[in-house]
Amino acid sequence: MRICFLLLAFLVAETFANELTRCCAGGTRHFKNSNTCSSIKSEGTSMTCQRAASICCLRSLLDNACDSGTDIAKEEESCPSNINILGGGLKKECCDCCLLAKDLLNRNEPCVAPVGFSAGCLRSFNKCCNGDIEITHASEIITGRPLNDPHVLHLGDRCASSHCEHLCHDRGGEKVECSCRSGFDLAPDGMACVDRNECLTRQSPCTQSEDCVNTIGGYICQRRISRLVPHRHRANRIGNAPRRMRDDPYSRAGEYREASQANTEFGCPMGWLFQHGHCVDVDECNLGSHDCGPLYQCRNTQGSYRCDAKKCGDGELQNPMTGECTSITCPNGYYPKNGMCNDIDECVTGHNCGAGEECVNTPGSFRCQQKGNLCAHGYEVNGATGFCEDVNECQQGVCGSMECINLPGTYKCKCGPGYEFNDAKKRCEDVDECIKFAGHVCDLSAECINTIGSFECKCKPGFQLASDGRRCEDVNECTTGIAACEQKCVNIPGSYQCICDRGFALGPDGTKCEDIDECSIWAGSGNDLCMGGCINTKGSYLCQCPPGYKIQPDGRTCVDVDECAMGECAGSDKVCVNTLGSFKCHSIDCPTNYIHDSLNKNQIADGYSCIKVCSTEDTECLGNHTREVLYQFRAVPSLKTIISPIEVSRIVTHMGVPFSVDYNLDYVGQRHFRIVQERNIGIVQLVKPISGPTVETIKVNIHTKSRTGVILAFNEAIIEISVSKYPF
């Protein structure tokens, strides 16, 4: 029975990854600016951010030391020996690796690095091997530009063309950085990712009652079944991501279950799993919990498994790293056997030598020579002298139309551009520049296509071939008319991007611009664009104000129009009162036995005063203790909330010591207002939210008292308050 596991992997939050990237970039930038990694100014205050900045700063320091060592090796023939300074060891290592590459080039040896070089050493070795050669269509070796030339590699393409197996990070430096997903470690070459064996590297990832089984990218904690099956669920894990065993009745979270009474004394041996009252075989091959290498095939057995060596057919070759079998194509004169190309002995299988000749087998071919000739290949006996003399094969026309060069015991044909001489087959063969000089023939933004005697470079979409036939130049779609952007076009390497003017957003087709309705977006957000009304326009918006208001220079604020200042009320018997959004003309109307204080003795703003005048015979008038009636007119906006009291009116009584004044609010309603007293001043305040349009009238009784508390005078203040429809 096969046991399947559901693997659940939790991804690290993108915001946290972006935070670490920002912190790392800060450390890199610190080294570039200061050339040190002390007193790093981190992008964040957390210990995690500071640690990331320190790591990336030291990485930049070591990369700089390696590059410095490479530069020294290009100019000098010896490397610095001071390895006790920070980065000194890596500087000398990269210098030695570059000198090794130069030695191989000087001896015309293949520039191939051995296994075991560090990532920095390998980069220096390859730079000194490949950075100074460039192959043209004619296969001539000339001096060219290195691969990190900004004209060859566009920054935007570097991750797309990198050899990172998992993740690539382009931080804008000289090179990109590779990293691996959770459960993998970066290989020494700095690009490949290898599985991390958590069962060996982590400290007790599983409990004592569980076996740790390594898997690709994670591990599994596999429970051992003891006498008592009940077991609190423990999640199987890949890295830190929990997963649950399917069809396992004892793997459900928070459950306890017991085996039947008939099986409570039953225990399963290693390689078996207790399930549904029985011990069932664990298929280690299907679970991937076996340790067979890539050169072996896992075969499940009852309670265990075995590893059988993989075998390939006679015409196949086994990859020593992956174990895969690939077909072998042998050249003429060879046949495949046991994964190798073996020479065909034409002298046995058949040849065309004459009667006076004998057949001599050669690698991949054969030759006919005079019988009894004891000379080596390429030589023949001189009948007169009895000595072996070189055979001038060029006189036999062996090279055809090509130039022939006779050599002791052999010959060589001088091949044309794009060809090379195969000494075993004695013929000129086409050079596949795309394979032999991979990465150095065409731009990284191009595909290399081999042709007979040459090669061609085919650029990727968005690029065009330069005049040298090898480099790819970016096509500016914005200026050539390829781009169909409605408003603005921005060229990027290999493509383009449409952008819109302010007030527009890019549509779904990526070319057309759609108007943004700013009024709808901001409506009801508490941060409206306009104080009054908002009207959307193409690419913008327009603010309007209600009647009685005017727009301010900022284009969004509304202020009240003071109609009274414009002389709207005419006549001395009227008082013009400006309200929010309007105005009122109040006729001066005093009660009986009161006359208008035309001299405005009490200096009432937005109102008037009426003074009592009685004849000596009018006892009723004389009995009225109210000496003065004040009329005030005020305006307030509609307010949904009030954080602190708002002053509406201020009444001043000009009475000094030893007299005192009391202010009392005579007001019936929802109690939106109150009056507070500061010495001889009464202040009317709005204390509760109020909505308009409406008019509120309140009365304030003013009593003047003597030092002994006797009321000496009565006065009244009648305040009419206009509440606006708007909150401004």
Swiss-Prot record:
Residue ranges constituting the EGF-like domain according to the UniProt record: 155-194, 195-280, 281-344, 343-389, 390-429, 430-473, 474-514, 515-559, 560-610
Pfam families xrefs: cEGF (PF12662), EGF_CA (PF07645)
Functional summary from the UniProt entry: Incorporated into fibronectin-containing matrix fibers. Plays a role in cell adhesion and migration along protein fibers within the extracellular matrix (ECM). Important for certain developmental processes and contributes to the supramolecular organization of ECM architecture, in particular to those of basement membranes.
An example Gene Ontology CC term for this record: basement membrane
Miscellaneous comment in the UniProt entry for this protein: Although involved in the same pathway as gon-1 and mig-17, it is probably not cleaved by these metalloproteases.
Tissue specificity annotation: Expressed in head muscle cells, anterior and posterior intestinal cells. Isoform a: Expressed in male and hermaphrodite gonad, anterior and posterior intestine and pharyngeal basement membranes, body-wall muscle, GLR cells, uterine attachment and mechanosensory neurons. Isoform c: Expressed on ALM/PLM mechanosensory neuron attachments, in flexible tracks connecting the pharyngeal, body-wall-muscle basement membranes and in uterine attachments.
Carbohydrate attachment residues: N624
Quaternary structure, from the entry: Homomultimerizes and interacts with various extracellular matrix components.
Gene Ontology BP term (one): positive regulation of locomotion
PROSITE patterns in alphabetical order: ANAPHYLATOXIN_1, ASX_HYDROXYL, EGF_2, EGF_3, EGF_CA
CDD domains (UniProt xref): EGF_CA
Signal peptide start-end: 1-17
Superkingdom assignment: Eukaryota
Residues of the Anaphylatoxin-like domain: 23-64, 65-96, 97-129
Family to which this protein belongs: Belongs to the fibulin family.
Protein name per its UniProtKB record: Fibulin-1
High-level lineage: Eukaryota, Metazoa, Ecdysozoa, Nematoda, Chromadorea
Record keywords: Basement membrane, Calcium, Developmental protein, Disulfide bond, EGF-like domain, Extracellular matrix, Glycoprotein, Repeat, Secreted, Signal
Disruption phenotype: Gonads have short and swollen arms. Pharyngeal defects. Movement is lethargic.
GO molecular function: calcium ion binding; extracellular matrix structural constituent; peptidase activator activity
Disulfide bridge partners, by residue number: C23-C49, C24-C56, C37-C57, C66-C94, C79-C95, C97-C121, C98-C128, C111-C129, C159-C168, C164-C178, C180-C279, C285-C298, C292-C307, C347-C359, C353-C368, C375-C388, C394-C404, C399-C413, C415-C428, C434-C448, C442-C457, C459-C472, C478-C489, C485-C498, C500-C513, C519-C534, C530-C543, C545-C558, C564-C576, C569-C585
